[in-house]
Amino acid sequence: MSNTGFRFKQFQVNHDRCAMKVGTDGILLGAWADVMQAKQILDLGSGSGLIALMLAQRSSAESRICAVEIDPAAAQQARENALASPWKEKIQVYQQDIDSFCTQTAQRFDLIVANPPYFEAGIACRDDERNTARYFTQSHLHWLQTAQRCLAPNGKISFVLPLAAGETLLKTTALYCIARCDVRTKAGKAPQRVLLTFAMQPQPLKHSELIIYDAQNQYHEDFVTLTQDFYLNF
């Protein structure tokens, strides 16, 4: 990965005008979220458009994706990334805050995804864009409740979060967690991230685990399997 962009098998993500660069969290969510039967998809806080592009690759030809990003420079770059991809007809980018979009839209979505801000408010940050991307004071519960406003009755919401933040969200939301994947950066280490899927109706929980690196510091086979449609070296 360079400071200007990241090349995947079927598309390029330029991110030099985005506060948050392409990273493992977004790649995990884009590869893990369940796109089966998802015709209308919403990516909240889209940044460079990474997750929207991954879901465009994985979803059916009939699927349509709305990518919402508050920062003007990032939204424009996400739009350019989408237009340069094989799925420019599937992705529409909106430069808007998530509250306004989810309040104003009449669309109801089958799948909503987000890699929301995760650092605590009050910590000094180097520039305003990164402050917006990483330190925004809205809670993860607020993000989930905002997403729920435009969720279809049988729709799903998928987040990627630090483990502690995910545990807190599970205790505070009234939605049902129907899928959970605990992510270990390395075999033998405690999980640091969690992928969560919520729904409005109860379903049996699908609980799994993913390891990124094995004990020999090589990519674990499960991580390769999950992401092999995207990474050039897999």
Swiss-Prot record:
What are the UniProt keywords, alphabetically? Cytoplasm, Methyltransferase, S-adenosyl-L-methionine, Transferase, tRNA processing
Q: Which organism is it from?
A: Aggregatibacter aphrophilus (strain NJ8700) (Haemophilus aphrophilus)
Q: Which family is annotated?
A: Belongs to the methyltransferase superfamily. tRNA (adenine-N(6)-)-methyltransferase family.
What is the phylogenetic placement of the source species in the record?
Answer: Bacteria, Pseudomonadati, Pseudomonadota, Gammaproteobacteria, Pasteurellales
Cellular localization per UniProt: Cytoplasm
Q: Which InterPro entries match?
A: DNA_methylase_N6_adenine_CS, SAM-dependent_MTases_sf, Small_mtfrase_dom, tRNA_Adenine-N(6)_MTase, tRNA_adenine-N6_MeTrfase
Its cellular-component GO annotations read: cytoplasm
Protein role: Specifically methylates the adenine in position 37 of tRNA(1)(Val) (anticodon cmo5UAC).
EC assignment: the record states 2.1.1.223
**Pfam families referenced in this protein's UniProt entry, alphabetically:** MTS
This protein is called what? tRNA1(Val) (adenine(37)-N6)-methyltransferase
